[in-house]
């Protein structure tokens, strides 16, 4: 009776055990692939030698610009122009006074 019961169980459970073993093998293969992919992680570096810009579009809106007083000049952006009059003033040196030491003489109080 024991033998018959064992053979019946083996006969019924054998396909299920085979499927379970196959699933375990597939799972182990997937785990190995996952571990190897962690070790072989790729880092991508991009080096750009030249950059060609075909069109640059500046959009400036002066519609909201209000002017209370108009005098002098309005420079937008970097300007490196110095009028000749101001340039001459900056180049002239101030006359230097003769450098004499400052001396203060005091008498002793008695």
Swiss-Prot record:
It comes from the Bacteria. Residues 16-46 form a coiled coil. Residues 85-110 are annotated as: Disordered. Keywords: Coiled coil. Residues 85-96 have a biased composition (Basic and acidic residues). This is Uncharacterized protein YocL.
């Amino acid at each position: 009776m024991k033998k018959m019961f064992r053979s019946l169980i083996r006969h019924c459970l054998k396909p299920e055990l085979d499927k379970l073993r196959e699933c375990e093998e597939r799972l182990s293969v997937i785990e190995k692939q996952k571990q190897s992919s962690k070790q072989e992680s790729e880092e991508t570096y991009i080096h750009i030698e030249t950059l060609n810009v075909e069109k640059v579009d500046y959009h400036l809106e002066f519609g909201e610009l209000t002017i209370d007083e108009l005098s002098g000049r309005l420079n937008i952006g970097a300007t490196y122009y110095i009028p000749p009059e101001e340039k001459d003033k900056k180049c002239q040196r101030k006359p230097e006074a003769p450098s004499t030491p400052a001396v203060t003489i005091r008498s002793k109080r008695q």
